[in-house]
Amino acid sequence: MSKKATIIAVVNQKGGTGKTTTTENLGVGLALEGKKVLLVDTDPQASLTVSLGNPCPDDLSPTLSDLMGKIMMENPITPDEGILHHPEGVDLVPSNIELSGMEVALVNAMSRETILRQYLDTVKQNYDYILLDCMPSLGMPVSYTHLRAHETSLH
């Protein structure tokens, strides 16, 4: 039987409400309890990526944008591709400003709501929890994140 990670999206339409801090602290807390945790930075501002010790997110590769692009092009990805390991016991899929361009590409993509789901399906067997740090919006990107966070959304 394959393991099914609990997926939690941390969302709010406003910026500066503590989404990133909540995502990071919840993730580290779960890791301290012995859980395998993946944090996914779905915000082009990359606050979670920076907060976890990556001060130049534009220099990172691959990022969430790159991984989603590969899925859109139907190129294979491996379950550990693009994942950074943090000393506090959490893993991170980083983001950067390129994710803004991915939002534009998703507008015209077939089955755009499945792109993030396809990525998460690739990695979920390796984790107990996957936490999604969402951008401040109720537009398309957040609604697609909600589609994937079938377990819980924190507002």
Predicted features and spans:
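P-loop NTP-binding core
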Residues: 1-154
